[in-house]
């Protein structure tokens, strides 16, 4: 096999993409794409501190807006992203 990094195969670089759902009277952009992620065995020292030990640890960065502003489209408040970067992942739970 060729010596090629295929870790992000099928996933484009983190960049601004036009959101066709919200782009009606003007373009609305959102950050989309892939960033760094990896999984590795949990170090024994860290495993001993866990309430529920997990033998695999993962770390990642997500494609997020570096700059954005709020705007309204058809009565809905949306954020129009103007710049993207790979940074801390934020998960929104209901």
Curated annotation (Swiss-Prot):
Gene3D superfamilies: Cystine-knot cytokines (2.10.90.10). It is found in: Secreted. PROSITE patterns: GLYCO_HORMONE_ALPHA_1, GLYCO_HORMONE_ALPHA_2, GLYCO_HORMONE_ALPHA_3. InterPro entries: Cystine-knot_cytokine, Glyco_hormone. This is Glycoprotein hormones alpha chain. Keywords: Disulfide bond, Glycoprotein, Hormone, Secreted. Belongs to the glycoprotein hormones subunit alpha family. SUPFAM superfamilies: Cystine-knot cytokines (SSF57501). GO terms for molecular function: follicle-stimulating hormone activity. Shared alpha chain of heterodimeric glycoprotein hormones. These hormones bind specific receptors on target cells that in turn activate downstream signaling pathways. Involved in gametogenesis and steroidogenesis. Pfam families: Hormone_6 (PF00236). GO terms for cellular component: extracellular space; follicle-stimulating hormone complex. It comes from the Eukaryota.
């Amino acid at each position: 096999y060729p010596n090629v990094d295929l870790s992000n195969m099928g996933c484009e670089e983190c960049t601004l993409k036009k959101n066709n759902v919200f782009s009606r009277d003007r373009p609305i952009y959102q950050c989309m794409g892939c960033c760094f992620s990896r999984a590795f065995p949990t170090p024994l020292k860290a495993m001993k501190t866990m309430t529920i030990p997990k033998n695999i640890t993962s770390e990642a960065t997500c494609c997020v807006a570096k700059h954005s502003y709020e705007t309204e489209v058809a009565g809905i408040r949306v954020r129009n992203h103007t710049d993207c970067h790979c940074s801390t992942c934020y998960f929104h739970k209901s």
